[in-house]
């Protein structure tokens, strides 16, 4: 049996008088274990354990600190979960359509209706959050490749928490609409939630088919939002429903614009979509061809707006409608040259997609004054 000696340089002595280095102290569950010094010759003792002072472990293995950190990070993760660019589009679209109705009927303005209008906006944001959230839950394997910054793909939000948020948003939105806006708007709202569900959720999961996918996005973002907000606003003001030229224009324009968004959003995601057998226009036709198709559709949208203003000069603010869309068309042409110069790289098409949303916002900013 080897005995550790405290003399010399910590050698261990054996009966054969050979020496070797002492074993390093052992650590066990935060405690440092060391052998006690040997006693004088002739007396032999078993090793005893001594404890050295070490920092106490965090309660619950550090889980309290982890929970506190997750709690502090939740607002940022939740904001990313809501997809801010879609939130901005919903807010701007709702505000613009409502403002247009009020500007056309200034005598009907009643500030007592403002709380109801804000409730309607909250309901739309809840529906928006549900649709983009459910998509992240079922797209997590794709987003790990295409969009690793999203909170479900990055692990900032667990699937269980994401589910809880989605169901809460859907229930809150549907409850607000049912309690405040009547059967027609409630039906339109639940239909929008249904389309958002079948877009992402198996067994239908229509996003894997190019044509149904863009039709759903165009319907929800283009028709349902504009028609629903316009109808609800006129009903709240006590006005019968009738299409105005400007709102008819924006509904058609944004529906086509939403089609452009639907096919360009997949341009940076070709790698992940191909790996998960998702069929998009980009995977079938190629990034360059789809980008040029989207640009062509958007350019046709602008040229159509200019032609409409010149043809129906009494229905629109011609200088603004024709002039603004001519400027936006020229801006699109310049941006197309930049995209072409970048050879339609993944970074370039991702930047182009983000930039297209600025054109979308600009259209709604123009609406009240057309």
From Swiss-Prot:
Chain segment of the transit peptide: 1-50
Pfam families (alphabetical): UbiA
Transmembrane intervals: 117-137, 159-179, 184-204, 209-229, 243-263, 290-310, 314-334
Cited CDD domains: PT_UbiA_HPT1 (cd13960)
Chain segments annotated as coiled-coil in the UniProt record: none
Gene3D superfamilies named among the record's database cross-references: UbiA prenyltransferase
Catalytic activity, EC: 2.5.1.117
Gene Ontology CC: one annotated term: chloroplast membrane
Molecular-function annotations in GO: homogentisate solanesyltransferase activity
Noted pH dependence of activity: Optimum pH is 8.0.
Cell compartment(s), UniProt: Plastid, Chloroplast membrane
NCBIfam families found in the cross-reference section: PRK12887.1
Protein name as annotated: Homogentisate solanesyltransferase, chloroplastic
Organism (species): Chlamydomonas reinhardtii
């Amino acid at each position: 049996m080897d005995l550790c000696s405290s003399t010399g340089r910590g050698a261990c002595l054996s009966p054969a008088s050979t020496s070797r280095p002492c074993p390093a102290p052992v650590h066990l569950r935060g405690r440092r274990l060391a052998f006690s010094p040997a006693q004088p010759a002739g007396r032999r003792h078993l090793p005893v354990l001594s404890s050295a002072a070490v920092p106490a472990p965090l309660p619950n293995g550090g889980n309290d600190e982890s929970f506190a950190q997750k709690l502090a990070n939740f607002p940022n993760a939740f904001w990313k979960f809501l997809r801010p660019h879609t939130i901005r589009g919903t807010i701007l679209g709702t505000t613009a359509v409502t403002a247009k109705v009020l500007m056309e009927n200034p005598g009907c303005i009643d500030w007592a209706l403002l709380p109801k209008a804000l409730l309607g906006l909250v309901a739309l944001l809840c529906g928006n959050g549900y649709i983009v959230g459910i998509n992240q839950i079922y797209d997590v394997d794709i987003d790990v490749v295409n969009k690793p910054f999203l909170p479900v793909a990055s692990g900032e939000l667990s699937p269980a928490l994401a589910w809880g948020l989605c169901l809460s948003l859907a229930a809150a939105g549907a409850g607000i609409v049912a309690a405040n806006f009547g059967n027609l708007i409630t039906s339109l709202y639940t239909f929008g939630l249904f389309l958002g569900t079948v877009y992402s959720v198996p067994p239908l999961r229509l996003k894997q088919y190019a044509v149904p996918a863009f039709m759903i996005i165009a319907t929800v973002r283009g028709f349902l939002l504009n028609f629903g907000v316009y109808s609800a606003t006129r009903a709240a003001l006590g006005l019968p429903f009738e299409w105005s030229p400007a709102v008819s224009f924006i509904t058609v324009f944004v529906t086509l614009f939403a089609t452009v968004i639907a096919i360009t959003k997949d341009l940076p995601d070709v790698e992940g979509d191909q790996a998960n057998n998702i069929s998009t226009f980009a995977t079938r036709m190629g990034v360059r061809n789809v980008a040029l198709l989207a640009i062509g559709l958007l350019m046709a949208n602008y040229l159509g707006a200019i032609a409409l203003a010149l043809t129906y000069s009494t229905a629109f603010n011609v200088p603004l409608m024709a002039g603004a869309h001519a400027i936006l068309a020229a801006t699109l042409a310049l941006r197309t040259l930049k995209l072409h110069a970048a050879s339609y790289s993944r970074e370039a098409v991702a930047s182009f997609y983000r930039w297209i949303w600025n054109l979308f916002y600009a259209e709604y900013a123009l609406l009240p004054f057309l």
